Structures are given as C-alpha cells and as structure tokens.
C-alpha cells in the first residue's frame, strides 16, 4: 500500500486550520474564565483613557 504524500497546498491548509483552531480555543478559554487578558496594576504609569457616551434628551426633543 502506497503512502499518500500531501501537496504544498494541503500542508498549508492544515497548518492554517491548526492556527485558527488554537486561536479559537484560546478565545473560548478567556471568555469562559471572564478574566481580562491584560491586568492593569494601580501603579501603572500609563494613563487610561475612558470614553463615555451620554445621550442628552434635550437635543432629541427639538
């Protein structure tokens, strides 16, 4: 019985599938643990920009 050799395209697709699968598993683990991927310490010297959207009903009444 002859052994099948994979073509270059098949090898590239297998590698791409493995990479996408590992990223998907990592995202599921991070989402399931509900822990942030990056933890900022209170002594972090980099300021954090917080943007908040507010809706003013006064403008909507006009």
UniProtKB/Swiss-Prot annotation:
<feature type="topological domain" description="Lumenal">
    <location>
        <begin position="33"/>
        <end position="38"/>
    </location>
</feature>
<keyword id="KW-0735">Signal-anchor</keyword>
<comment type="subunit">
    <text>The resulting sucrase and isomaltase subunits stay associated with one another in a complex by non-covalent linkages.</text>
</comment>
<dbReference type="GO" id="GO:0004575">
    <property type="term" value="F:sucrose alpha-glucosidase activity"/>
</dbReference>
<feature type="topological domain" description="Cytoplasmic">
    <location>
        <begin position="2"/>
        <end position="12"/>
    </location>
</feature>
<feature type="modified residue" description="Phosphoserine; by PKA">
    <location>
        <position position="7"/>
    </location>
</feature>
<keyword id="KW-0472">Membrane</keyword>
<comment type="function">
    <text>Plays an important role in the final stage of carbohydrate digestion. Isomaltase activity is specific for both alpha-1,4- and alpha-1,6-oligosaccharides.</text>
</comment>
<protein>
    <recommendedName>
        <fullName>Sucrase-isomaltase, intestinal</fullName>
        <ecNumber>3.2.1.48</ecNumber>
        <ecNumber>3.2.1.10</ecNumber>
    </recommendedName>
</protein>
<feature type="modified residue" description="Sulfotyrosine">
    <location>
        <position position="59"/>
    </location>
</feature>
<keyword id="KW-0677">Repeat</keyword>
<feature type="transmembrane region" description="Helical; Signal-anchor for type II membrane protein">
    <location>
        <begin position="13"/>
        <end position="32"/>
    </location>
</feature>
<keyword id="KW-0812">Transmembrane</keyword>
<keyword id="KW-1003">Cell membrane</keyword>
<keyword id="KW-0326">Glycosidase</keyword>
<keyword id="KW-0511">Multifunctional enzyme</keyword>
<dbReference type="GO" id="GO:0016324">
    <property type="term" value="C:apical plasma membrane"/>
</dbReference>
<keyword id="KW-0378">Hydrolase</keyword>
<keyword id="KW-0597">Phosphoprotein</keyword>
<dbReference type="GO" id="GO:0004574">
    <property type="term" value="F:oligo-1,6-glucosidase activity"/>
</dbReference>
<keyword id="KW-0765">Sulfation</keyword>
<keyword id="KW-1133">Transmembrane helix</keyword>
<comment type="similarity">
    <text>Belongs to the glycosyl hydrolase 31 family.</text>
</comment>
